[in-house]
C-alpha cells in the first residue's frame, strides 16, 4: 500500500490510551491520515467533531480510535446495567455496519472492550444473544436499534460516545426521525462525546446534526476537490445499442484486477450481470433484492478476490471500504451528482491510483452537465471505433436459470482474443 496518503503525524504522538496505540500498531497503523490528524486532537480533548473527507481517507479509524480511547479513559456509570452499551455507532446500511464492526474487532482484542452488532434482514436472535451478555460498543442500523430498544433489550441511558457515520446518507434515506428517537433516549449532548463523519456534508445536514451535538468543531480534508486526484476519469458517448458491447470491450482492454460496475436500477444491474456471467467473467451482483446473507457472502468473495467484478446499485456506493479496487465503471451516469463522487471513490483509495470510466448513453447523458458542475471539472472524453467492438457475445444469463458457477479459474491474457476486441480501441477526443 502506498504511504503517500499519510501525514508525518504518528498515533503515538497523541495522548491516546496506551492500549489503543498498542492495538493500532499491532495492525500496522503508525502514521495518521489527514482526517485522523485533524480529528484526534479535538476528540482527545473532549470536543465534538463533524468531519468531512473523501472516501478511503481513514474516517472509520478516526472515530474508532476516539471511541476506544474515550471509553478506556472514562469510567462507566456506576449504575450501568448489562443491557446498557457505553458507545453507539450508527450506519445507514447493513453492509457498512458489518464493516465497521469488523474494523472495530481489530481494536477490541487488545483493549477488552466488548462489541455488539445490530442490523435488520436476518440474525435477530444471534445478535440478541450477544447483547444479552452485555456490550461496550454497539454498531448498528437505526431500524434494528429501535426494535431492540422498544423491546428493552438495550437501554441507551448510559451512552458516553455516539457516532453517526455517512451522516448525509442517513438523512437522505429518511432516517432523521429514527436518529432523533434514539438521541432522545441518551444522556444530554454535554454528557457524551459526539462524532459525525461523511464524505459530503450539506448545510442542511450540518444544521440537523448540530442539533444533537455540543458545539461541534467542523474539520475537512481537500474540500474543494470532490474527486480524488489519484483517480483517472474517462468518458464515452455510446449509443444504447452499442453500450453493452462497449463495456465488454473495455473490460477486455483494461482487464481490471478488481472493478465495480454501477447501474441506476436493479433491473439494469441484473442485465449487466447476465451478460458478463454468460461471457465467463467471475462476477457478483449486489442489489436490494439480494438476500442479506448472500450480500455479505458476495462482498466477502469480492474482497478476497474469488470474484473480480461486482455489479451494483448505489447500495454499495457509500462507506464500504473494499481494498485495491482498480476500476469503477459507471454503466449509467447517476441521477444524483453526489453519487458520482461516492461511486468513483471506491477506487483510488488509501494512496493507490484508480480509474473511473463512465458511459454517457442517450438515456442518462443529460445528467452529465450537473455532474461536471458539481465536481468542478469536465470529464475527459474519449472516442471509440464502433467497428472494433466485440461482436460475438453469448446470450445473457438470467437469474431464473440454475446458476452457473462463476468462481472457476480466471481467463488469462494469453487466451485467444475474439474478433472485434483489439487493444487500444480508443483515443482521446480533441
Swiss-Prot record:
Complex and partners: Component of the RNA degradosome, which is a multiprotein complex involved in RNA processing and mRNA degradation.
User: Pfam families from the entry?
Assistant: DEAD (PF00270), Helicase_C (PF00271)
Taxonomically, the superkingdom here is: Bacteria
Subcellular location(s) per record? Cytoplasm
Q: Which organism is it from?
A: Pectobacterium atrosepticum (strain SCRI 1043 / ATCC BAA-672)
Motif DEAD box boundaries: 165-168
Name of this chain's protein? ATP-dependent RNA helicase RhlB
What Gene Ontology molecular-function terms does this entry list? Answer: ATP binding; ATP hydrolysis activity; RNA binding; RNA helicase activity
Enzymatic reactions: ATP + H2O = ADP + phosphate + H(+)
Keywords, ordered alphabetically:
ATP-binding, Cytoplasm, Helicase, Hydrolase, Nucleotide-binding, RNA-binding
HAMAP family from the UniProt entry = DEAD_helicase_RhlB
What gene name does this entry carry? rhlB
Q: Which residues form the Helicase ATP-binding domain?
A: 40-219
